[in-house]
Amino acid sequence: MFTLNLLLYIIPILLAVAFLTLIERKVLGYMQFRKGPNIVGPYGLLQPFADAVKLFTKEPLRPLTSSILMFILAPILALSIALTIWTPLPMPNTLLDLNLGLLFILSLSGLSVYSILWSGWASNSKYALIGALRAVAQTISYEVSLAIILLSVMLINGSFTLKTLSTTQENWWLITTTWPLAMMWYISTLAETNRAPFDLTEGESELVSGFNVEYAAGPFAMFFLAEYANIIAMNAITTILFLGSSLTTNLNHIDTISFMLKTLLLTMAFLWVRASYPRFRYDQLMHLLWKNFLPLTLALCLWYISLPIALSCIPPQM
């Protein structure tokens, strides 16, 4: 029974990731006035499965001078963390109902740094190492703003439990009152998932392919799956935090469809950003966080702390 539950949890995520890669190629294709994948299956719908078969049947090569254990463990850790992040998310029901669900998600996203660092260091390649160091600095930096934004949202929510956010947003979504936080959160999730215009870790013109340059076949596919699973997970968290994950109805299937549609629209925005914007310079990336986002998020956090205290003398209105 446990194995069946595990499969029912993992397979839909992997299927969503598979079709997200297809949607991305189709969207980018049409934005660049071309068709995208259209050969394998009707309208190219079987392309993700063809890619999966190709990647997982190839021989996984590794550099002769690489550190074998870390080289093998890095992609496994990346995919494991990407799949574990989904456990406390209410969609509208959770797999693991945690009191500190948001802290759990924040700590897991911090752990994903290790898989990138291990892969870059264990490859024994200067390009992979530079890509890994960039990724670590970028991820750790943007986690600061993510943590402060989460703290601000939790001050409004009054709890670290994700399920209570749907109750908080019964009358109106938090994005209406906290839109500056939502905007900074969304840009920070782009940086956290190493997506364009913050894809400095995979700068093809500079670093060949970034931290995974020495990976091929199955291990490379695992990194790929982890990246796209993280993208969908981050957009799901954005939906829960700012867009009210469930409606006021007691119909779970309608709540789930609403949640899925919001997450899909946010994910499509990720692809639109990739097609529209060029890559940032590294110094611009760091300036955006430390000189713009950090002061703003701290100021807003102090505002949300002081507002309830300042208004505590006013009697509640009926």
Swiss-Prot record:
Enzyme class, first EC level, given as a word: translocase
Q: Report whether Transmembrane helix shows up as a keyword of the record.
A: yes
Q: Which GO terms describe its biological process?
A: aerobic respiration
What are the alphabetically sorted keywords of the record? Electron transport, Membrane, Mitochondrion, Mitochondrion inner membrane, NAD, Respiratory chain, Translocase, Transmembrane, Transmembrane helix, Transport, Ubiquinone
Q: Which Pfam family name is an example for this entry?
A: NADHdh
User: In which compartments does the protein localize?
Assistant: Mitochondrion inner membrane
Q: Which domain of life is it from?
A: Eukaryota
Catalyses which reaction(s): a ubiquinone + NADH + 5 H(+)(in) = a ubiquinol + NAD(+) + 4 H(+)(out)
Topological relation to the membrane, as annotated: Multi-pass membrane protein
Molecular function terms, GO-annotated: NADH dehydrogenase (ubiquinone) activity
> Which cellular component appears as one GO term in the record?
mitochondrial inner membrane
InterPro entries in alphabetical order = NADH_UbQ_OxRdtase_su1/FPO, NADH_UbQ_OxRdtase_su1_CS
EC number(s)?
7.1.1.2
- Major subcellular site: mitochondrion
Concerning its family, UniProt says: Belongs to the complex I subunit 1 family.
- Record's function text: Core subunit of the mitochondrial membrane respiratory chain NADH dehydrogenase (Complex I) that is believed to belong to the minimal assembly required for catalysis. Complex I functions in the transfer of electrons from NADH to the respiratory chain. The immediate electron acceptor for the enzyme is believed to be ubiquinone.
**Name the UniProt record assigns to this protein:** NADH-ubiquinone oxidoreductase chain 1
- Please name the source species: Sminthopsis macroura
Its gene?
MT-ND1
